[in-house]
Regions:
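Short beta-strand->loop
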Residues: 7-9, 100-102, 119-146, 160-164, ...
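Stable alpha-helical elements in mature extracytoplasmic
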Residues: 11-15, 19, 47, 56, ...
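Sec-exported extracytoplasmic/periplasmic mature domains
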Residues: 20-29, 52-56, 65, 72-76, ...
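Short helix-loop capping/hinge motifs at secondary-structure junctions, enriched
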Residues: 103-109, 128, 141-149, 226-234
Length: 307
């Protein structure tokens, strides 16, 4: 049996559980070899750091390109990884939405409602969670749409984050805080987490699609050094390639992620609000720049959160 390890971010557990079974069956049928995939999940930034520190991942499927770039800087992932797989190595996308309790008691309709007095917001910590970085940028995109003055944008972000009562280390922890522990009035969430919550707890929650959000592009890569050492390069490549097949893209849609295959995305037209205006990471100058400006030590997040 060939074993490979996929180090992934927080809310992808259920998707990869199903996908791994699908891939293992396909591999057995096509190559007549047994393969077993081991999963690891947590906040994307923490997961990237664990690979840098020696966690033996063959592949990484993380929340944002920046997390894989961190691993690339150590030489574990080959330069140019982003061109190795289609669509800039992003086999699925998502966006950021607001999840509220049934009946929307606090009347939350858009990002500015999250800055009102008495609104309790739940969102994870961008220092450890990739989803939290997308959450921050989605809100900042709204602020940029409203004001060109950076001080006004910062003031808006400061008011929003002043209302955050619990900041978990990962997106799944934030969902647990909101759903299981009943804390907060609104959860800033991955669209796929919000959809999954709606399916599991029918009738208890509502999704609010804000006027502006962000195209979240989780990235995938082979951890080349580890895969070479483990003799798993070929399986690792096929594992990530298989994400782009019609069969896998359909599973992606069923799991609440947006398939990058346009035809398959259309099949799920009712699941997703495709009318939300989506900023992209390029509107923020790409990840390197966005990370420096917003999430590095003493950058914008620290400035507005620790004031």
């Amino acid at each position: 049996v060939i074993t490979i390890t996929n180090v992934s971010y927080d809310p992808t557990r259920e998707f990869y559980e199903s996908y791994n079974t699908m891939f293992e069956e396909y591999y057995k049928k096509t190559y007549n070899k047994e393969v077993q995939v081991i999963q690891s999940h947590g906040g994307s930034g923490s997961q990237a750091r664990s690979v840098v520190e020696g966690c033996n991942a063959d592949v990484v499927t993380l929340a944002l390109e920046h997390d894989i770039s961190l691993i690339e800087k150590t030489g574990l992932v080959d330069a140019g990884w982003i061109k190795e797989f289609p669509k800039s190595s992003a086999p699925y996308t998502s966006t950021i939405v607001l999840l509220v309790r049934k009946g929307n008691p606090k009347q939350i309709h858009d990002w500015d409602d999250l800055t009102r007095k008495g609104v309790d917001v739940i969102t994870p910590d961008p220092k450890s969670s990739g989803g939290a970085c997308w959450n921050f940028l989605a809100a900042l995109g709204y602020a940029k749409t409203k004001w060109s003055d950076e001080n006004k944008q910062k003031e808006f972000m400061r008011r929003l984050y002043h209302n955050v009562s619990v900041m978990d280390s990962g997106a799944r922890g934030a969902t647990t805080t909101f759903v299981e522990n009943g804390k907060g009035d609104v959860l800033i969430a991955w669209e796929n987490e919000a959809i999954a919550t709606m399916k599991s707890y029918g009738g208890k929650y509502e999704i609010v699609n804000p006027s502006v959000s962000i195209l979240a592009q989780p990235s995938v890569a082979i951890v080349d050094d580890n895969a070479k050492a483990n003799g798993s390069e070929e399986v690792s490549k096929r594992y990530l390639d298989f994400l782009y097949t019609k069969q896998a893209q359909r599973l992606i849609g069923k799991s609440g992620y947006r398939p990058t295959d346009k035809e398959i995305l259309q099949e799920f037209g009712n699941e997703f609000d495709l009318s939300i205006k989506l900023w992209t990471i390029d509107d923020f100058g790409g990840w390197e720049k966005a990370y420096q400006k917003c999430f590095d030590d003493d950058a914008m997040f620290d400035e507005i959160y620790n004031y």
